[in-house]
Amino acid sequence: MKFKTLIFSLSISFFAGLMYQCQVSKNSRANPSKEVQQLVDYMVGDFSSQAQSVRDSDFYDIRLHIRPIWKNDASNHWLYVEQATAAAEHKPYRQRVYKVEKEASGGVKSIVYTLPDPEKWAGKYKTPEAFDQLKPSELSLREGCTVFLKKQKDGSFIGATQGTDCESTLRGAKYASSIVTVTATELRSWDQGFDEKGAQVWGATKGGYEFVKIK
């Protein structure tokens, strides 16, 4: 009888432990998804570096617009990103599409793509449904330019590109790097280009641009 009681107790302990492990596993899978949504919510909006440009003339007054696109794709988060000087918002100098998803290590990654015929999409952050005419398969992946981010204790996300595989030819550069911090009210981005010897040839030297969310 004592032997049966022992077996029963062990069985209860085993199944309780198994159920706990399943719950932990379930939670560990769910948390990254919540972090992805939180990061996307932080990123979507209109941003300005005007305040920084007033404080420091080494920085330009830049406008950054980020909008969700392809909302019918329930399994992925796609963002259209447009960047232009405040003096020429109708002529963006950078247009990208980001695919934001959970990363295998538990963080979040933002995969970077370029658009075909980017001029056609200039200003389309105002009407993001226009991207329904475009398919994800028509985008071009920016190899090595993915930004890997981790959520911090204060709720912000901090991350960067990895290695030297994000190709750039601007001003004699060989590769580019990005260091990013995202909060509910601000997006900081430090983009730099380096030549084959590792010397910086473009980008801010003091630190990143500080984009304050204005809408």
Region locations from a protein language model:
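Bacterial Sec-dependent N-terminal signal peptides
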Residues: M1-A30
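A generic structural signal for short, non-catalytic loop/turn and secondary-structure boundary residues
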Residues: I12-F15, A74, V182, A204
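Short, charged, low-hydrophobicity "junction" segments
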Residues: Y20-V24, V54, A160-T164
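Short, solvent-exposed loop/hinge segments that bridge or flank secondary-structure elements
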Residues: P32, V36-Q38, S49-A74
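Calycin-type beta-barrel ligand-binding domains and close structural analogs
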Residues: P32-D46, Q50, A87-K215
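Residues at beta-strand starts and edge strands
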Residues: Y60, S75-H77, G106, T185
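N-terminal glycine/threonine-rich, aromatic-flanked beta-hairpin/loop signature
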Residues: L64-Y93
